[in-house]
């Protein structure tokens, strides 16, 4: 693949769409800083002591303006950083340009091919002589996956001389991963094992990536400690819920200009992301229907006045379909064939396998009409009617809009900084084994507290008598570990 790394005048590596967009990115970054009090508080509290001095951090997370503030928080605390996006459509090119010019090595641009995406991921992990990163900030688990698959292939190659065969899988993306690893064996047959030996740990941002980590922990194949940032309350109950409540209608309207009021909208899944999406559509005037497998989540939806049906019940009646499950094969091509003309189909889960894009793309005689970037009308030959698919089945709020707003991302990214600090500060203590951990409650509460002042909140304080009565410390933590917010 004919891609090459470029360098700034200071020698920093990068590959972005257009470095001349850096000034624009810097202006938006400065606006975002005001809306991200948690990250700015981290700079104030930890910056003087430079706790990340000597640390190499690789990040695979949407290269947005908000992520730019996270990156510059990590560098302000002393880290060296290399970054790529975790989605081919989610990068904001002006944000990538600003960071590449001013702060860190970035390999990201909006509209990457899958080959380019994995090239960027490989570059993000490549620190040259001396192995890879000390720490990983991951979103969806692709950087973690590449290292695990690389180590597995190197061990097999050393034992038997066998190299990965890209044709051994039907998954087109995994073919690319195996090709990268196979080609890497020719130049360095221990590259990923050297990365593994150096790695202190990973902090994972999203539900999908966390599932991967727990699967590896269960199978005994997890190679390094991991902190599950997603299940911090100040992440899942804010980013996943309120972030999606904001960004789903933003993406829908930017992509289609459709009026949501009066439409029938189907939300597949009613976890935190699904709850935010359903609330947004309901507030916009849609008649919302939810599909669910979990009776508890289904009952929650019913208590909100939302009908629970199967996709088959409503596929020919609804106007908007949103997948939020984190699972595969939710909306299949046979469902899409039965939809009404110009029904909108989109996904706000991390990967592109919730909607059967392969089945749609290979359907005999189907015609794809690109209306604008990330907005395509697919016309079926039998009916001459079509559906509108957003962001090619990938994250529509980042593919068709700019994702979640800065304030809610400050909550998530403050958790990331704290998780990275926790891993780095405890690297020699043995506190963290090759398992998945969640940040303790007092740190979760600290993240929330850092964001209250921006909104003008004033907390009530327990008296000593009240504290003794309910056996809760005056300064917290205020809830038990299993409390459900």
Curated annotation (Swiss-Prot):
UniProt: substrate binding residues: 64, 139, 205, 235, 239
Cofactor(s) it depends on: NAD(+)
InterPro entries: Adenosylhomocyst_ase-like_sf (IPR042172), Adenosylhomocysteinase-like (IPR000043), Ado_hCys_hydrolase_NAD-bd (IPR015878), NAD(P)-bd_dom_sf (IPR036291), S-Ado-L-homoCys_hydrolase_CS (IPR020082)
Keyword annotations: Hydrolase, NAD, One-carbon metabolism
CDD domains associated with the record: SAHH
Quaternary structure, from the entry: Homotetramer.
Gene Ontology BP term (one): one-carbon metabolic process
Source organism (scientific name): Triticum aestivum
PROSITE patterns registered for this protein in UniProt: ADOHCYASE_1 (PS00738), ADOHCYASE_2 (PS00739)
Protein name: Adenosylhomocysteinase
Cofactor binding note: Binds 1 NAD(+) per subunit.
């Amino acid at each position: 693949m004919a891609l090459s790394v470029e360098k700034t005048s200071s020698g920093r590596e990068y590959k972005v769409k257009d470095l001349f967009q850096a000034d624009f990115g810097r202006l938006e970054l400065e606006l975002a800083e005001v809306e991200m009090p948690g990250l700015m508080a981290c700079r104030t509290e930890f910056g003087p002591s430079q706790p990340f001095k000597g640390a190499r951090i690789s990040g695979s997370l949407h290269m947005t303006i908000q992520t730019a503030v996270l990156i510059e928080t990590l560098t302000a605390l002393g880290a060296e950083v290399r970054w790529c996006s975790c989605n081919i459509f989610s990068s904001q090119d002006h944000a990538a340009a600003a960071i590449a010019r001013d702060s860190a090595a970035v390999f990201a641009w909006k509209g990457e091919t899958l080959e380019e995406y994995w090239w960027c991921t490989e570059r993000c992990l490549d620190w040259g002589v001396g192995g890879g990163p000390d720490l990983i900030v991951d979103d969806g688990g692709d950087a973690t996956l590449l290292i695990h698959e690389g180590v597995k292939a190197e061990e097999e190659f050393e034992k038997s001389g066998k190299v990965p065969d890209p044709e051994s899988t039907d998954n087109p993306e995994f073919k690319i991963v195996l090709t990268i690893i196979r080609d890497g064996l020719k130049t360095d047959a221990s590259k990923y094992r050297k990365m593994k030996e150096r790695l202190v740990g990973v902090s994972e941002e999203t539900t999908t990536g966390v599932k991967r980590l727990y699967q590896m922990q269960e199978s005994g194949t997890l190679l390094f400690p991991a902190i599950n940032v997603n299940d911090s309350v100040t992440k899942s109950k804010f980013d996943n819920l309120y972030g999606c409540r904001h960004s789903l209608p933003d993406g829908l309207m930017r992509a289609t200009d459709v009026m949501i009021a009066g439409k029938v909208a189907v939300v597949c899944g009613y976890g935190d992301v699904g709850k935010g999406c359903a609330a947004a559509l309901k507030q916009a005037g849609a008649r919302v229907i939810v599909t669910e497998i979990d009776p508890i989540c289904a009952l929650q939806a019913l208590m909100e006045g939302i009908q629970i049906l199967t996709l088959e019940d409503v596929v020919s009646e609804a106007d908007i379909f949103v997948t939020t499950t984190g699972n595969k094969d939710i909306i299949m091509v046979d469902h899409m064939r039965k939809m009404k003309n110009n029904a909108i189909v989109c996904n706000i889960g991390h990967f592109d396998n919730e909607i059967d894009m392969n089945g749609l793309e290979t359907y005999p005689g189907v015609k794809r009409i690109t209306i604008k970037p990330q907005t395509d009308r697919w016309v079926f030959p039998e009916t001459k009617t079509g559906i509108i698919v957003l962001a090619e089945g990938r994250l529509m709020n980042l593919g068709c809009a700019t994702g979640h707003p800065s304030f809610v991302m400050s909550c998530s990214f403050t958790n990331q900084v704290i998780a990275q600090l926790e891993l780095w500060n405890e690297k020699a203590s043995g506190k963290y084994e090759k398992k998945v951990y969640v940040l303790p409650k007092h740190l979760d509460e600290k993240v929330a507290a850092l964001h209250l002042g921006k909104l003008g909140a004033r907390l009530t304080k327990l008296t000593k008598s009240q504290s003794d009565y309910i056996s809760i410390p005056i300064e917290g933590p205020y809830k038990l570990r299993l409390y459900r917010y």
